[in-house]
């Protein structure tokens, strides 16, 4: 019941963004600037804040967690580039669907859900599992959104993107057992906390610009959403279960992967001048659907 309540609360913020756009408080120009601020400023702060608690995770788990995280995203990379070709022949749509299948809304929705299910300490493990997400979303994710699948399109500057640098610093803090002074941790945490409502309201605002028939979705949207919410997380869960990954790590990783489509999809579309309609539809449908699927998936852990 608690997990369902958290999902409903987050969805209400999406609706708030929808209403704000309809009332004229949000729109294309504002959303684009807010998206850039979330991507480049508040999200890196959110990543850093996840390792600025009183207790740090067991250092011996850092490499295993990173290993599981990277292996997960390598599998998702293959899945994200191959499966969309079976769903549609439209090149641009393939990229959008691939992004949706690969990247879950971990930083914005995943951390609160992980905390509510496994306790506040588990957010540190989720942050480590999510580090590969930060790398791949700013490399493969950008390629998918832009529709440029060649490795030649890779920009080395992405390795120095604020979000990835934030993840590197977070890993160093954990590895060396650094406890951040409260005078630094508190403003970082406050800045990072802007990410969740801002990102969700951007989704709602983008949704407000869609015709009703697009909000309702199309067969490919529902198929992609089902793959995102059910097939992908269950496949990852049972695969690592068979491979002998510890229940604690596997359970947290599964919840991380079971989140709805990452808000970065919509924000990347706005940032790179792509049509956000399809990715926003999938984000909306998966956000609504996850209210049911995430609590059901957690039944595997009981």
Name each region found by the language model.
Residues 1-302:
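Alpha-helical transmembrane segments of multi-pass small-molecule/ion transporters
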């Amino acid at each position: 019941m608690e997990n369902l309540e958290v999902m409903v609360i987050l969805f209400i913020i999406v609706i708030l963004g929808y209403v704000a756009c309809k009332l004229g408080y949000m729109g294309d120009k504002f959303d684009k600037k807010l998206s850039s601020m979330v991507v480049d400023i508040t999200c890196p702060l959110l990543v850093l804040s996840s390792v600025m608690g009183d207790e740090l995770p067991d250092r011996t788990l850092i490499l295993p967690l990173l290993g599981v995280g990277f292996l997960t995203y390598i599998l998702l990379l293959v899945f994200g580039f191959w499966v969309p070709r079976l769903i549609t022949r439209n090149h641009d749509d393939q990229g959008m669907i691939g992004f949706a299948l690969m990247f879950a809304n971990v930083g914005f929705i995943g951390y609160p859900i992980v905390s509510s299910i496994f306790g506040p300490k588990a957010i540190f493990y989720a942050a480590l599992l999510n580090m590969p997400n930060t790398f791949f979303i700013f490399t493969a994710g950008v390629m998918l959104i832009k529709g440029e699948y060649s490795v030649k399109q890779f920009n080395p500057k992405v390795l120095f993107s604020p979000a990835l640098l934030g993840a590197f610093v977070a890993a160093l803090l954990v590895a060396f057992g650094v406890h951040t002074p409260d005078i630094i941790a508190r403003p970082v945490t406050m800045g990072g906390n802007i990410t969740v409502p801002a990102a969700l309201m951007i989704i709602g605002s983008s949704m407000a610009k869609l015709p009703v028939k697009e909000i309702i979705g199309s067969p490919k949207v529902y198929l992609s959403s089902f793959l995102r919410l059910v097939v992908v997380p269950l496949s990852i869960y049972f695969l690592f279960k068979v491979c002998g990954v510890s229940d604690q790590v596997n359970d947290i990783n599964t919840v991380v992967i079971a989140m709805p489509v990452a808000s970065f999809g919509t924000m990347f579309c706005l940032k790179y001048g792509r049509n956000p309609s399809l990715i926003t539809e999938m984000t909306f449908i998966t956000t609504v659907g996850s209210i049911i699927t995430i609590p059901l998936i957690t039944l595997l852990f009981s």
